[in-house]
Every structure is written in C-alpha cells, then in structure tokens.
Amino acid sequence: MKKTALMLSAIALTISSSIQAHEVTLENVARDFADQPTKETDWYMSRLQKEIPVNTFKHNRIPSNKDHQFVIRENEDTMYSHAILDVTKSATILMPKYDEYAIVQVIDENHYTIAEVYPGQTLNLTPDMLSSGTHVFLNTRVAASNSQDLKALKKANEYQDSIKISSVTSNPYVSKGFSEKQVLAARAKVQKLRPKIPMPFDMFGNKGAVDLTSFVIASSAGWAGLPSDAAVYLPQIPGNTGSTECSSLTINPPPLQYKRHAFFSMTVYDKDGWIADDDFAISNKRMNPNQDGTYTFRFNCKGQPNNLDVQKGWSGLLRMYLPDSKQAIQNYVLNDYLKNAHLVKGPNIK
C-alpha cells in the first residue's frame, strides 16, 4: 500500500512538473526557450534557401499585403529583399546613395543583428563578426516616397536592383534540422508574452546588447526587428482589448531623423501576427496632422481618414524608424506615449 502511494505521488509530481514546464512566463522564457531565436532564424533561412541560391537576392517588388508576406509581422512601409550570404571567408554589401529610407540588416544564425548598412555605405563582412556559424540573413528594407504610387514603387524597385552583394565562397546554407512543428508550437507559446515585453528598447541587436528575455520573446513575435538605434517598436497599443468597434489613437510625432527620411507608421495584425486585411497600415507620409500637430490613427471607423481595418483579437504595432537618439526615443515613449496615448472609442475627430 505504501509502495503504491509513493508511485502515485511520483506520477503526480511528474504530471505537475510537465504542466509547469509548458507554462511560459517572463521568469522562465529566456531559460526554457533560450534556443528559440536560433530555431526561428533557421526556419526562415531554410525556407529562403529552398527558393533561391546563396549570395542572391529575392526581391519583393510590392509592399507586403495579406496575400504577400514572408516574415511574421511585416509591414507596408518598405519593400523587402532577402538573401543568405556565405561569410565562410568574407563577403561584401554595397548600397548606393538613395533619397528615401533604405537599410540592409545583417542577421547571424542566432538572430543577432551584427550590422546595419545604409545608402552610400559599403560593409565588408568577416566570420569573426558572427556569434557563430558561417552564413547571415540579409533583411533589406527599401521605402518608396508613396507606397501606393506606381511611379514611386518603380523607383524603389530600381534601387533594390542597385544593391550589390558578393562573397568569396558560395556554400549553401544547411538547415540545422529543427522540427518545424516544434518551432511553430514554441512560437505560439512564446509570442503570447509579446504584450509584456519588459525592455522594448533592447529586443533586438548584437550579442551582449539585448535584454535576453525581451530578445527571446521578440524573436518569435517579430523576427528580424531592428535594434533601437535604427528603429523602435511599440508592440501594444495602450487600452487595446482586441475589440472591433470603431476606435482611435492620437499621438505626438516622435523624435526622429526626418532629414534622413525617417518616419513612423501603424500596422495592424490578426491574433496570430499576420496581415489579414487590405487596409492594414499607414505611415505619417500619407497622413495629415491634426491642427495641434498630433496624428490620429483610426481602427474600423469606416469613411474616416487614416482608418485601418481590424479583426477580433487584433493587435497594432507602432514603428518609429531612425530615432534622433536612444535617449530621446526612450524619453518620448516613457514620458509622452505611455502617459498620453490611449485607445479611445469613436473616431476622435480633431
């Protein structure tokens, strides 16, 4: 009888431990899912390697939309070009000058952003710059002056073609063999913590420059985000409950390097982080400010300016490209946005 009781206690303890192991929290996510950034990166690199040869760009000629998206939580702000670059010995990225926003983000196999390249710059890559591995993922963003103007899109497409990459070696990227089912299952668990990210300024960056908990969550919730010197992402709209009723958000313009074609935008997603509607994004380039200089985004307010369509359980992501400085954008977020911006019912016409 005593032996049976001990066995039952052991079984109960095992079941309890199993349940706890599957409960993802801010306290355990960095420990239990430490390799998730590497798995996510391998998932994207393996998919791309099947589509194009190494050291070759795959250009997306139109902005992302509900029928055309490769990475979770993409946006309409820029057109993406993706490549896997072999850095076994050395490689080079060359970006000609351009009079709109553009950037090549260099991501190593562990999802660390090891470099950023802007128009007019050339970068020489060597293997010692990587945290590990021999290949990098190039996440290139090229903006048009107006994402809905065909002439502007053509100009941006021509610039995409002018970006040059080269490498001494051409070894294909070899998948690490992670189970896609396990990667996606872990992603579903980890990204539930997205609204609770503790350090939104340190979600992305190079090794040693990120907050590990924020980094692990963001790797699943918004893979290939830029470091805060290049962009800041606010993954939660204050007051948003995922309701589909007409609502609005008014903000002060953030401190950005507008002379370098900096801009800010709002993009909305479904409950899983994917683009689900036609009118899902807008940037300040296509908005008229209110009389007091503020900007108002509207959600499911048909017929109103700056309106975005949303579905039940939606989330919104405010992107701010090229902050004046890390200190300036932190001050804006903490002392302006989080204190003054709040989702309200109705179109809030000013």
Question: What does each model-found stretch correspond to?
Answer:
Residues 21-350:
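A compositional/structural signature for long, glycine/proline-rich flexible linkers
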